[in-house]
Amino acid sequence: MRKIVTIDGPSGVGKGTVAQALARRHGWAYLDSGAVYRLAALFLKRQNLSLAATATQVAALQEMAVDFVMTETVVRVFLNGVAIDDVLRREETGALASQLAVKPEIRAALLDFQRNFAGDAPLIADGRDMGTVVFPEAPLKIFLDATAEIRAERRYKQLIEKGEDVTLAALKKEIAARDARDRNRLVAPLKPASDAVLIDTTDLSVQAVLEKIDALWQAHFFNF
């Protein structure tokens, strides 16, 4: 069985920060599912295609190539060989990705891409349905959560540090809307896998979350 750890949760809960730290610490491959959907949205836009789920869009996505290159401090993301970090994390890109993710045909087109990512290499995968849909066989599944207010505040700090012009009120509204879309969509709604370990990060630092996961890691993979 392939070594896989899935980390799911809502927007702004710290999935990426935690998953990247674990991937660096253990030398595993890293898959950012949220980035895949963001990249798909950007790819379609750059092909002058709408976000509709037609055969044209599904076929176009077969030509999308994604690479995550991990350095000591950041993860560089490449779309068909071109660095895309500058627009990938913008709020408008996230909103487009969330719209795309509710379309069953698009999700199906990207499912095999994610399952085959990095071949048989050990993998850390973060997203919203990694443990429930993409890697239901993963030996260790984690679901991170936090209050919407805390998640908005964390995201606000990140974006301000990057020099983006955002308001906390707007972020709270966007996160509430995204939560509703993600939790209520008919296909792969945001929810913990039945065997996932739930961790509330509202009052926890990143280091505290990593310590909890490391204890679980030892229990699951020490004799794997």
UniProtKB/Swiss-Prot annotation:
GO molecular function (one): ATP binding
Family statement: Belongs to the cytidylate kinase family. Type 1 subfamily.
Protein keywords: ATP-binding, Cytoplasm, Kinase, Nucleotide-binding, Transferase
Residues annotated as binding ATP: G9, P10, S11, G12, V13, G14, K15, G16, T17
Major subcellular location class: cytoplasm
GO CC annotation: cytoplasm
Species: Dichelobacter nodosus (strain VCS1703A)
Gene label: cmk
A GO BP annotation: pyrimidine nucleotide metabolic process
Listed EC numbers: 2.7.4.25
InterPro entries tied to this protein: Cytidylate_kin, Cytidylate_kinase_dom, P-loop_NTPase
Catalytic activity: CMP + ATP = CDP + ADP; dCMP + ATP = dCDP + ADP
Domain of life: Bacteria
Locations listed in the record: Cytoplasm
Class of this enzyme: transferase
Protein name: Cytidylate kinase
